[in-house]
Curated annotation (Swiss-Prot):
Organism: Bacillus pumilus (strain SAFR-032)
Principal location class: cytoplasm
Gene expressing this chain: hemL1
Protein name (Swiss-Prot/TrEMBL): Glutamate-1-semialdehyde 2,1-aminomutase 1
Catalytic activities: (S)-4-amino-5-oxopentanoate = 5-aminolevulinate
PANTHER family for the chain: GLUTAMATE-1-SEMIALDEHYDE 2,1-AMINOMUTASE, GLUTAMATE-1-SEMIALDEHYDE 2,1-AMINOMUTASE 2
Amino acid sequence: MKFTESEKLHQEALEHIVGGVNSPSRSYKAVGGGSPVAMEKGEGAYFWDVDGNRYIDYLAAYGPIITGHAHPHITKAITKAAESGVLYGTPTKHEVTFAKMLKEAMPALDKVRFVNSGTEAVMTTIRVARAYTGRTKIIKFAGCYHGHSDLVLVAAGSGPSTLGTPDSAGVPKSIANEVITVPFNDIDSYKEALDRWGDEVAAVLVEPIVGNFGIVEPKDGFLQQVNDLTHEKGALVIYDEVITAFRFMYGGAQDLLQVKPDLTALGKIIGGGLPIGAYGGKKEIMEQVAPLGPAYQAGTMAGNPASILSGIACLEVLKQDGVYERLDQLGAMLEEGILAHAKKHQVDITVNRLKGALTVYFTKETIVNYEQAENTDGEMFARFFKLMLSQGINLAPSKYEAWFLTIAHTEKDISETLQAVDRAFEQLKQS
């Protein structure tokens, strides 16, 4: 494959856009550098770049594009919105329809509020939890990403259940001191944190199924134990379902795992590809939000008709029979093939898969927490990524990210992908 136009475009972008990208995850820094491929068109399971190369896409825009690119039902809804005016600054009937759909999907949502991104949704759930409890500290799990607000750009401290340290320049230490970071799937460390700071904790922020250091499921009983211990201390449980909602099951991870949070943050899939976020939860907690309560949150673009209509259309597609069974079937086919080729070429990998999403780790170890994911072979992944890209398979350029299947993928796409995996593993072993 030739990437001449992508390389030219990246050089031009560097002159005008910071780092040449509008999100650092789009750069190729984590896979050894180089010019990121610039895409020009998406349709179904495929991308075409500015050089005319075609790719089978497993990035899915980091998760939102579960229906495939340019799904006709969603495209029709967006066109309708464009023709009717994309922004009013007033209530609309569509936002009521969409709120009802989210509540029907997730019974933990008594009340809902729309925002513009997953970052906003998480940020606001924390504010609401603090308003409701009168406390300030938050517990999060190491390696879990909850957006780029100061409140959650916090890394683990010097050991389990410690106060965090800023994970970005510009985040004050005073903010990091309000965040306690513990290892995921480690209930003893969680108990230790609550024993030490429980009376100061407003909420625990949880990815019920981790999606940001790969796909990592909670151990049996872990989430329920977290719920029970948190409530014993008078704190709230916030589920960050920005990735997981409507990805593994229509009702989200909380339905799949049969656990119920106090507050939920949503994003990605619920916009059908357009910018959106939402948060919701128990009525008495959500009534802390203005104009009913003292916790302020607002947004010019919040609930805009384009994103709302796109989201409604997306959920209408996902509510059809057999969607999640189909994603699981394709995911199993992909996982089995990857493992078979790894065994054939004696390449050490572990695959974590849940239905239509999976992560390939270059390690023999079973991954259940961030420390293990961090210790996987990033150099080997970088080589694998570039070998796959050169064969027309588009993956996320990071060892921590998932492969996301869409309902547009076919068995033929999986077979073509596995042929590329076979050749990539062969070259990795030879070199």
